From Swiss-Prot:
Function: Phytoglobin that reduces nitrite to nitric oxide (NO) under anoxic conditions (e.g. during flooding or in waterlogged soil) and upon root nodulation. Required for general plant development and during nodulation, especially for the onset of symbiosis. Monitors nitric oxide (NO) levels during early phase of the nitrogen-fixing symbiosis and buffers oxygen in functioning nodules. May not function as an oxygen storage or transport protein. Has an unusually high affinity for O(2) through a hexacoordinate heme iron because of a very low dissociation constant.
Induction and repression of expression: Induced by nitric oxide (NO), after treatment with the NO-releasing compounds S-nitroso-N-acetyl-DL-penicillamine (SNAP) and sodium nitroprusside (SNP); this induction is repressed by the NO scavenger 2-(4-carboxyphenyl)-4,4,5,5-tetramethylimidazoline-1-oxyl-3-oxide(cPTIO). Triggered by ethylene, auxin, cytokinins (CK, an equimolar mixture of kinetin and 6-benzyl-aminopurine), polyamines (PA) and jasmonic acid (JA) in roots, and by abscisic acid (ABA) and ethylene in nodules. Induced by hypoxia and cold stress in seedlings roots.
Summary of the tissues where the protein is detected: Mainly expressed in root nodules, and, to a lower extent, in leaves, roots, stems, flowers and fruits. Accumulates in mature root nodules.
Binding site for heme b: 51, 65, 69, 99, 103-104
Name of this protein: Anaerobic nitrite reductase Glb1-1
Subunit structure: Homodimer.
Amino acid sequence: MSTLGSTCFTEEQEALVVKSWSVMKKNSAELGLKLFLKIFEIAPSAQKLFSFLRDSKVPLEENPKLKPHAMSVFVMTCESAAQLRKAGKVTVRESTLKKLGATHYKYGVVNEHFEVTKFALLDTIKEAVPEMWSPEMKNAWTQAYDQLVGAIKSEMKPSSS
């Protein structure tokens, strides 16, 4: 497990994240795809980071590899957020973090990509649970996302394998 400490992720923030994630979980494939479509709408050049999208003539929403990838990213992000306070840190296995860091490094992911993703994630969550959305919920998800990204960035170096 990563040992990056959590900077006061409160019980209230945890409750907001857990409550919204429990509603979104059943639609994670659809919401993950929405997240990535938003990312590519904001930053079309980000598509070049994905080998399976580079030469694809298929519309993004029909790409057979995008939906499973998008769902796994969305689920990992949300599960990590939901467990942040209880665990006291980002709960992605260290081997997974190292792999995520190395992959993001290899493909040239930069801070702006993480910022675009954060904006798209918050927008996706806001649309998924509009009746729950509040400034407090936005702050809770922002803090959880920032901690996950911090953990990934700490591993962004060339792969040792």
